[in-house]
Amino acid sequence: MLKSRTKSVSELFGLPDPPATGRERLVATAIELFYRRGFGAVGVDQVIAAAGVTKTTFYKHFEGKDDLMVAAVQRRDEWESHAWGRAVRKIAGDDPIKQLLAMLDVMDLWFNDADFQGCMFVSAAAEFPNPHDPVHQAAAAYKQRTRDHRRDLARAAGAESAAAETFADCYTALIEGALVLRQMNGRNDAARVVRPAVEQLIATYLPQRLQEKQQAPNRRLKTIG
């Protein structure tokens, strides 16, 4: 776990690059408004006004709100995937097991951040429940990618293919449950609540790797002796 609680989400995540073009301003503004108010509550005119661009600029880049919503979800996906990966590596380095646990440390910081407004991808899927809707598909693509990343870490830690798939599904269910616990029940400690279950998953599906870690200090002591 994090040794210091002084690190903030912004310190770990970093800030998105400032938008340089009219299209980027529109997308960045849409992300902010959709995240805070919801997709259905924000109209195109509000985004245009907040972005400080003209309607001509908007329709030069987007056919309408649907296109903007998809672009916003996809851009949030790109930034968040990079930011989370960087934050986890800052804590855990390249060790896959440490990274799997560090994800909970980063999530704990996020859950306790003053700007926490829930998960934009969950909100997008909830507002657009049809699995064929482009907004739903963009949100689902992010969730699938994060699930697959956990599977890849399990494989890197020594899990067989089938075990890694099961591990990823179970870990993802715990993470999504923690999100619901935080967002609906206001439990700031939700990431810490699921941590013992994640540790048990690791012990169950990656026992050989854990055993190697536990034996390493003993081997060093024997070498020194």
Summary of predicted features, one role per range:
Residues 1-21, 155, 208-225:
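N-terminal intrinsically disordered/low-complexity leader segments
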Residues 2, 25, 29-67, 71:
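Helix-turn-helix
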Residues 71, 85-113, 167-171:
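Hydrophobic alpha-helical connector segments
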Residues 78-81, 88, 98-101, 117, ...:
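Amphipathic alpha-helical packing segments from all-alpha helical-bundle domains
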Residues 87-89, 106-111, 121-130, 153-154:
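Helix-loop "lid/cap" segments that line or gate small-molecule binding pockets
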Residues 98, 137-138, 156-172, 189:
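All-alpha amphipathic helical-bundle segments outside canonical DNA-binding/catalytic cores
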Residues 128, 182-185:
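Secondary-structure edge/capping motif, primarily at the C-terminal ends of alpha-helices
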Residues 162-181, 193-201:
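Hydrophobic alpha-helical segments that form the core
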